[in-house]
Structure formats: C-alpha cells, structure tokens
C-alpha cells in the first residue's frame, strides 16, 4: 500500500490538563475539513477528543503527514505547531494500529478497563463517516478496533474491577467528607459521566442529588432516575449554595463557574466548605476558585492517586489483554500488506477472463448458431477453468507474500511473467489456437 497509517496525539501522560484543555477539539469539523482536501496527501482521518486525550488517525502519503496534521490541529485552536509539538506522540504503521487497539480496549486509559473510551471512539468514527472522512483502511481499522475491544472484555477480566473517572471522583469525595449521608451533591451536566457519578453517589449514601443541565429535560430525566431534583441552568449560581459536593462534566468551551460567583455562594453558605471536582476538559471550573478559603477544587489529573490504587488488581489481566492486542495488530498488518497484492490478483484474473471470453467468442463464431443453454454451459465451463487455472498461482503468491520479507519481488515476477502491465492481451496469447487450427487444416 502506497499510503501509511499515522496516529498523532497527546494524552494524560504527555500533557497536563491545562495543555489538554488548550488543544481539545470539542468540535472536530474544522480540523477534518482542513486535513482532508480532495486529492491531497491525506485521504482519510478520524479524530478522537476526550477529557484525557486527543488523537488523530490519518491515512496519507509521505513523511510530511504528521506535520500537516499538527499544523491543522494547532490552527484549529488558534495556536502554533511549535506550541503543540512538545506534548505530542506520533505512531506509524503497525505501531499506530497497536496503539489504537490498546486505546479501544481501555489499556491506555487513566483508568484501565473503563468502558467510556470505546463509546467515545465509536462516536468519533460515526462523525468521521458522516463527513465522508473515512475510506477502506480506516473503516476496516476502526471496526477491527471495536472487535478487539470486545474480545479483550470477553476473554480477560481487565474490566471486572475497573473504576471509572466518575467512581474515582466520588471516592475522593468520600475521603474528604467520610460519612456522606449528611451531605448534598450537585451534578453539572447530564451525560454518561454524570450518570455514573450519580450511581456512585447514591451507593455511597449521599443525602440528596441535584442535577443542573443546559437542556432541562435531560437533567430532569437523570434526576428522576436517581430520585433527585433537576435545577434550571440559569439558577445554577443560586442553587450552588445548597450543595456541599459539586461534580461538573459538561462539554462547555469556557468555564461555567468562576471565582467571583463562588465568593457570593460562600457568603450565603456562611463559609461552610465546598468540594468541587471538575472532570471536564476543557475545564468547567476556573482554577482560581481553588484560591478561595473553604473551597477545595480537584481536576481530572488529581484523581490519579485513586486510580493507581486500583491498578494492581488488574495488572495480570492487562497483560493478557495486551497479548490479544499484539495478536490482532499482527493480523491487521497482514491484511494491510495484502492490499499491495490485491491489484496483481485482480489483474491476473481479469487477464485470464479476457482471454477466455475472446476464445469463447471465436469458438461460437466457428460453431454458428447455438441455443442459450449451450452458450450458458460454455460460459460456466470457462469460468470454472479460469478459477481452477489461477487457484494455485494465487495461493502460492499469497503464501509467499505472507511468509517472506521479499513479497514485493513475487509481485514483480508475476506481473512480468503474465505481462499484466500491458493493456491488451498479447497476440501470442492465441498462438496455441493458431497452431491447433493449422494442424486441423493439414
């Protein structure tokens, strides 16, 4: 295959939450349209942007692909490539495939085994397909990533004791407050992470849950699910005074809670402590809030300690999962390599079929009128001959191509042997027929 798979990204290991916030791609439209102009050096792209990572999968020609992607990415965020490069990793070929399979299987997550990343990857793929940004290679790669993730979950226990970011947030709250039954929590946002947080809060014995969401109906639905109260988003600054624990996970582009807002809230609370956990990227809560007395603000990076304690339980299972990823990455690499062989197989079959059809036409001309049944029988016979004659050469070619590094040499030999780069069937293709006819005439 002339084109190569690239994966360019940053994540919670290479970049702080501040950096991830700066380069988050909450709307990937501009970038996808910028990276895939028709007929340019990049033909396919899928963009995954979550609170813990931004990763761009691209199929393109030449070593300049990563720089091109980085330029578009930085420009989409109003930054320069030089601002982005220190935090970025670039994977190519099978390394890109292996990394994506690890991401899909949640082996590269802050919380190994958490289920959210697979849904986020599927959503990213759906959006790319909707914008016609994928073709054969990424379509195959993403679907394979989904099946690898399913296999990892089925064949290993990597997810059995996994904690989600939402679980880690609630565990952190329990460490601060201890007994939760006397406290009231507010969830800002009503997505999957908020729903998970509500589940864990309820299990921890929280006294009451409030849900504030821009779309009131969705907030109301979540609140009812957990016997809580829905709050109008415009009343957020007023109702915050009732909450001891606030967990925020919206998709806002700018902070929705600022220090000046909390100063007023603290006065109404008579300076009773407030505990904020911001698990959104970009962040929902202005970091300056943490400078206020009686306010404790934690962001997604602060949850690592809780997560690390859970890691030891899953190390053995993660090792099994990585073996699966390695195996499947190797299988995908073979398929990718086979794309180089496919045109030769197609050309070989077409050549045989063209010769067969020419011979059929000559034979029918010599025979004169024949009925449809005879014509169909002759056609079926020729198709069978073409398949059987080509079966052994194609099987040999595939086997040698898979087994040996010099697979491209076999392609070259085959193309030259059968004259596959010539548009027309050579005149000597009919030489046997001519010699046979001369003997018949003698």
From Swiss-Prot:
CDD domains the UniProt entry points to: NAD_bind_Glutamyl_tRNA_reduct
Active-site residues, Swiss-Prot/TrEMBL: 51
Domain of life: Bacteria
Cross-referenced SUPFAM superfamilies: Glutamyl tRNA-reductase catalytic, N-terminal domain (SSF69742), Glutamyl tRNA-reductase dimerization domain (SSF69075), NAD(P)-binding Rossmann-fold domains (SSF51735)
Pfam families per UniProt: GlutR_dimer, GlutR_N, Shikimate_DH
Catalytic activity: (S)-4-amino-5-oxopentanoate + tRNA(Glu) + NADP(+) = L-glutamyl-tRNA(Glu) + NADPH + H(+)
Keywords for this protein: NADP, Oxidoreductase, Porphyrin biosynthesis
UniProt-listed Enzyme Commission number(s): 1.2.1.70
Record GO terms (molecular function): glutamyl-tRNA reductase activity; NADP binding
Presence of keyword Oxidoreductase: yes
Record-listed substrate binding positions: 50-53, 109, 114-116, 120
Enzyme class: oxidoreductase
Swiss-Prot/TrEMBL site (Important for activity) positions: 99
PROSITE patterns given in the database record: GLUTR
GO biological process, one term: protoporphyrinogen IX biosynthetic process from glutamate
Residues at which NADP(+) binds: 189-194
Family (UniProt): Belongs to the glutamyl-tRNA reductase family.
Domain characteristics, as noted in the entry: Possesses an unusual extended V-shaped dimeric structure with each monomer consisting of three distinct domains arranged along a curved 'spinal' alpha-helix. The N-terminal catalytic domain specifically recognizes the glutamate moiety of the substrate. The second domain is the NADPH-binding domain, and the third C-terminal domain is responsible for dimerization.
Anything else known: During catalysis, the active site Cys acts as a nucleophile attacking the alpha-carbonyl group of tRNA-bound glutamate with the formation of a thioester intermediate between enzyme and glutamate, and the concomitant release of tRNA(Glu). The thioester intermediate is finally reduced by direct hydride transfer from NADPH, to form the product GSA.
Function: Catalyzes the NADPH-dependent reduction of glutamyl-tRNA(Glu) to glutamate 1-semialdehyde (GSA).
Subunit structure: Homodimer.
HAMAP family per the UniProt record, alphabetical: Glu_tRNA_reductase (MF_00087)
Protein name: Glutamyl-tRNA reductase
